[in-house]
Amino acid sequence: MKFTLQHKDPSSQARAGELQTDHGVVKTPIFMPVGTAATVKGIFHRDVRDEARAQIILANTYHLYLRPGMDILERAGGVHRFSTWDGPMLTDSGELQVFSLAGCRKLKEEGCHFQSHIDGSRHLFTPESVIDTERTIGADIMMAFDECPPGDSPRDYAAKSLALTERWLDRCFNRYRQTSPKYGHYQALFPIVQGCTYPDLRARAAENVKQYDADGYAIGGLAVGEPTDVMYEMIEVVNAILPEDRPRYLMGVGTPINILEGIARGVDMFDCVMPTRNGRNGQIFTSEGTINIRNKKWEDDFSPIDPEGTAFVDHVYTKAYLHHLTICQEMLGAQIASLHNIAFYLRLVTEARRHIGAGDFTPWKEQMVAKLGRRL
């Protein structure tokens, strides 16, 4: 895996680059649609690739571990063959789901004991078992196993949690170096920088992960309830320390404005469920602001969903029709909204990349942030 830094914005920390994987090139900055169970909910892979123009998608280790399970995935030849997605893929380590969805029943030095949210069965995730699981899934980029504490954690707990994450990280890399890919393509392992909202803990974590000389680095534990300005401050603290020649991934973030502000602070990769989850509930993102398509004002608006959009749904369907589908809870409404939103996110980062290359990212970003904050 190779990351090439191609352009730097003269008036911010924004960067444009290329990440070479065995499944293709990813041009950064990039947004990664979330395909939790090896599918971006409600959208054909063909449309994710060709209409939304996604270059890389994300899948979730916790969910794939429980269903379909590692035996099925290994017999299928890994997640790429199983799902037929032939582009780059990233798996998170499942730590967020273990600590939230499943409910971590017992957190120990060895790992986390938890119960399946599906059938209540008991399981144990350790740094070693998570690396083994991610090897079996076979994504191009794997994430280290860590603890993601609440954003408002007291300092003593945040420090204790970070120390555990650092010990787990060492075990993750030991296991990673002891094992090999199962399906013939290279797999990178990204460490995750934690530290809650404490600048000194974030700085310590960023310094610590540098020792692993990883292919890339992730920033976790943000957008979990802390004020937005604090999130931006933590990004600045971390990115001032992380190596400049490696990609930086901000996990689980966020709104279109968050993404532009993250790019301005030197982030290269993003993922978030917002475009699909919020789309299913009637929130439509556009370059002129946000639409709640459930509102009555759209019931007789026969204009296209987004005249500037790049996906076919933006021009074929009207706001009135999407309003009707959403109110009636028709599956097609969720599909249209999800595809539009993902395509919008991808168009946004593509435009950001173009402006970074042109040297005028900052004034463009400021204009976009002003528009994106509007409620239409």
Across the structure, where does each feature detected by a protein language model lie?
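Glycine-rich phosphate/ribose-binding loops and adjacent secondary-structure elements
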Residues: 163, 175, 179, 186-305
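C-terminal extensions of enzymes
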Residues: 1-18, 26-32, 41-42, 146-152, ...
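Structural signal for hydrophobic packing residues in well-ordered secondary-structure cores
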Residues: 138, 169, 173-176, 180, ...
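Conserved, mostly hydrophobic/aromatic
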Residues: 24, 57, 92, 134, ...
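Short, ordered coil/turn segments that flank beta-strands lining enzyme active or ligand-binding pockets
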Residues: 22, 287, 357
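Non-catalytic, usually N-terminal nucleic-acid engagement modules in DNA/RNA processing proteins
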Residues: 1-182, 296-299
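Glycine- and acidic
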Residues: 151-155, 159, 216-222, 331-334
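A non-catalytic, amphipathic alpha-helix used as a structural packing/dimerization or gating element
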Residues: 129, 133, 160-171, 204, ...
